[in-house]
Amino acid sequence: MKKYILSLTIIYSLNLSAQQWITPVIDGYGEIKYSQQVAVQPEADLDYKLIYKITSSEERNGVIRGLNSIAHSLNMLGAAKVRATKIQVVSSISGPATSLILTDEAYQKKYGKKNPNTALINLLAENGVKLYVCSQAVAYKKIKASDINPNITSALSGASVMANYQLKGYVRM
């Protein structure tokens, strides 16, 4: 019996590792390895109300990790056949991550290159993700309103976004 269970475990593990990385919803970002042979899957009949607090400037695959995490979640939900109408995603951006909100022109002026997050920000917005930036962080970093990506909305504070949406039933990711 032990050999049988060990054999099944090895076969299952090989099946998972052989699968390709995919990005079914947010093309090119938030790669996932999807498998139907796992115990817990996103449930297509649930309403997914998710909120992300993005404060770190840490990068993953060339973009801010928090944005990549949102893409990852949308790709997992999409691969599991959860309809877009069942998914609502919001993010609160503040702290060291605030610079991700800059337009390409403003980012170029400040860092000498185009904003590597712009394409992902645009894809997330096209897929209904609401991206809010803390106006306190914007003021602290002396960012002009004209330098903010048009897909980013200013909020009084990151804390107000987090509180309001969690009180509306959003789950913090």
Regions found by a protein language model. Name each.
Residues 83-101:
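Acidic helix-start/capping segments at beta-turn-to-alpha-helix junctions
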Residues 20-27, 104-108, 113-173:
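A cross-taxonomic marker for long C-terminal extensions/tails that follow the last structured domain
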Residues 27-48:
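N-terminal targeting signals for Sec/Tat export/insertion, comprising classic cleavable signal peptides
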Residues 1-4:
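Positively charged n-region of N-terminal signal peptides that target proteins for export
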